[in-house]
């Protein structure tokens, strides 16, 4: 009866809260106001190294055409560059594998600052979320241990029109 339902509801709520517990955001130490050598707000249309792969009106998504996708020197599955009204505002990186995940975490910490390693701060469970928050840029990484797949968003925080079209959902 009631006790069984209350216990089940409590178990569901507990699991939902702990399945994807994010780590606390840490300050982004070196905010480059962009991604690699491309400042936020830049037009990608004139840049030869990019090809448009999707066009959804005010949103356009590009990929680099003359090189394999890599974050630093780490090979990844894909890197996509999103513009909103022709202004560069987001990079989405997808990758697979626990070894790649560890290499990417090391790379991001060397570039943007160390994560808070206080016990309880780093996530446990099937979904791990890490966030670096700067003045111009936010870097958010989500890794699912069950599928060994990760996604990273590098996003402009200062682009006047926030990219709120739903493409920043962390789904694979």
Where in the sequence are the language-model features?
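Bacterial N-terminal signal peptides that target proteins for export
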Residues: 1-10
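Residues marking helix boundaries in flexible regions
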Residues: 13-14, 94
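C-terminal segment of classical bacterial N-terminal signal peptides
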Residues: 14-22
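Non-cytosolic coordination micro-motifs
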Residues: 25-65, 92-172
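Short, compositionally biased low-complexity segments enriched in polar/charged residues
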Residues: 67-85
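Short beta-rich binding modules
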Residues: 87-89
């Amino acid at each position: 009866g009631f006790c069984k339902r209350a216990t089940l509801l409590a178990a569901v709520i507990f699991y939902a809260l702990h399945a994807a517990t994010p780590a606390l955001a840490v300050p982004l130490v070196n905010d480059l106001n962009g991604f690699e050598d491309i400042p936020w707000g830049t037009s990608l249309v004139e840049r030869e190294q990019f090809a448009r792969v999707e066009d959804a009106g005010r949103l356009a998504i590009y990929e680099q055409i003359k090189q394999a996708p890599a974050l630093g020197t780490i090979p990844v599955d894909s890197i996509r560059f999103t513009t909103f009204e022709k202004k560069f505002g987001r990079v989405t990186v997808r990758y697979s594998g626990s070894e790649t995940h560890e290499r990417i975490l090391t790379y991001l910490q060397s570039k943007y600052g160390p994560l808070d390693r206080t016990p309880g701060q780093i996530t446990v469970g099937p979904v791990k979320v890490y966030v670096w928050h700067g003045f111009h840029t936010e870097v958010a990484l989500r890794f699912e241990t069950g599928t060994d797949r990760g996604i990273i968003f590098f996003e402009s925080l200062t682009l006047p029109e926030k990219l709120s079209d739903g493409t920043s959902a962390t789904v694979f």
